[in-house]
UniProtKB/Swiss-Prot annotation:
Domain 4Fe-4S ferredoxin-type as annotated: residue spans: 50-79, 97-128, 129-158
Cross-referenced CDD domains: PsrB
Residues at which [4Fe-4S] cluster 4 binds: C118, C138, C141, C144
PROSITE patterns linked to this entry: 4FE4S_FER_1, 4FE4S_FER_2, TAT
Inducers of expression: Transcriptionally regulated by Fnr and by the TtrR/TtrS two-component regulatory system.
Keyword Transferase part of the UniProt annotation: no
Origin organism lineage: Bacteria, Pseudomonadati, Pseudomonadota, Gammaproteobacteria, Enterobacterales
Subunit structure: Probably composed of three subunits: TtrA, TtrB and TtrC.
GO CC, any one term: periplasmic space
Transmembrane segments: none
Cellular localisation: Periplasm; Cell inner membrane
Name the record gives this protein: Tetrathionate reductase subunit B
Binding site for [4Fe-4S] cluster 3: C106, C109, C114, C148
Membrane topology: Peripheral membrane protein
Length: 250
């Protein structure tokens, strides 16, 4: 568990600068507080663009994706990179309440709002579109957490750094599926390279192009987690009253 004793000097230096900025925010632009060098980002290949399609018609809310993700990525208790939320939606002019399942995770946007707000360039987008966090640079300021419109980030209290779904990039690079995709009982989650027209995800996105939806399209983030069978109440804006996930005690 992170204790703060071995924090490297560059992080200490930045936190000292951040304290100065906080005291005189109107005088010094945040962008001036940086690590002494800018990192080179070469991870991934521009020949690929990874995305996920979630077929809600096949999701049963079993939370196997949540459990397998937690095991694979060793997230702290009570913190999740992905989960399936249950919502209650009431139609306008109707007394009927419908229960709706909605898997949530980082949307790996083309225009990720979490990236430009990071003062130390710890959050960045790979050339294949996957958004990741460099834990060696992250100082846990939580600016990216606040900037994410999908509530997909959190501060890992063990590492004291930002945490989120990475599409299990370590598994993708080994030729494996993300833990959530591999464990999905209903086969609701599909991941692949949308630049490959023969990939399963590209084929399905084309076949169902009139039914594919994303969350909060009005934000202009160009999310790359696509939904098939998404209730209109969750498109613009995300509405409905969130209920405890099915696996939680209520």
């Amino acid at each position: 568990m992170w204790t703060g004793v071995n924090m490297d000097s560059s992080k200490r230096q930045f936190l000292q600068q951040l304290g100065v900025l906080t005291a005189g925010a109107s005088l010094v632009p945040l962008a001036e507080a940086k690590f002494p060098f800018s990192p080179e980002r070469h991870e991934g290949s521009p020949r690929h663009r990874y995305a996920m399609l979630i077929d809600l018609r096949r999701c049963i809310g079993c939370q196997s994706c949540t459990v397998s993700c937690t095991i694979e990525n060793q997230t702290p208790q009570g913190a999740f990179r992905t989960t399936v939320n249950q919502y209650q939606v009431q139609r306008e002019g109707s007394q009927e309440v419908t229960n709706v399942l909605l898997p949530r995770l980082c949307n790996h946007c083309d225009n990720p709002p979490c990236v430009p707000v990071c003062p130390v360039q710890a959050t960045f987008q790979r050339e294949d579109g996957i958004v990741v966090v460099d834990n060696k640079r992250c100082v846990g300021c939580a600016y990216c957490v606040q900037a994410c419109p999908y509530d997909a980030r959190f501060i890992n209290h063990e590492t004291q750094t930002a945490d989120k779904c990475t599409f299990c990039v370590h598994r993708l690079e080994a030729g494996l599926l993300p833990a959530c995709v591999e464990s999905c009982v209903g086969g609701a989650r599909i991941i692949g390279d949308i630049k490959d027209p023969h990939s399963r995800i590209a084929t399905m996105l084309h076949q169902h192009r009139d039914a594919i939806k994303v969350l909060k399209p009005e934000n202009g983030t160009s999310p790359h987690v696509f939904y098939l069978g998404l209730d209109d109440a969750f498109v613009t804006p995300l509405m409905g009253r969130a209920q405890p996930a099915l696996w939680q005690e209520v």
